[in-house]
Amino acid sequence: ASDVYKRQASESPAPGGGSISVYMGALGAALGTMVANLSSHKRGWDERWEEFSDWAEKGKAFQIQLMKLVDEDTDSFNKIMDAFSLPKKTEEEKAIRKQAVQEATRFATEVPFKTMQLCYECMSVAKAMAEIGNPNSVTDAGVGALAARAGVVGAFLNVKINASGLDDKAY
């Protein structure tokens, strides 16, 4: 966590808000998973071990999918920057550059859209753990849901700003 914190405070534009939105979703999934794991080992709940283990596996799957998107989001930003750095002296270069910018922008819109979907879906783990999990960990489940929600909202902002650069407005 301290490495992420230090990198975010640097002068580099990436990873930025998109990657942090993904990371927030992953943290939300991690908290839901933690509550599921704690609940599976709660004294007196031995017969519910499998139920909570299933929720923990769902949460872990969301974490893995989201963490893959952290790097994908940074890559999408870098592709846009690379496209904008292409030469634009001749008409042919301008056309190639414009197409590259549009393709990179489309990709940079798809990544946060996937982030929105996964962050929203991972809230199901936090919700279930708030309802059926260890009552001593209900606040952890709540913070997990809030983190995942922040991921959804942050990703939405990135979809909105990235989509504004697309010529194909129907996309």
Language-model region placement:
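Conserved phosphate/anionic-ligand binding catalytic regions in large, soluble enzymes, centered on
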Residues: 10-33, 136-155
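Disorder-to-helix initiation segments
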Residues: 9-20, 44-55, 59-62, 94-101, ...
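Long amphipathic all-alpha helical oligomerization modules
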Residues: 153-171
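A structural-propensity feature for long, helix-poor, extended segments
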Residues: 43-85
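Amphipathic alpha-helical interface segments
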Residues: 73, 77-146, 150, 162
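Transmembrane signal-anchor/signal-peptide helices with a preference for the extracytoplasmic
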Residues: 34-46
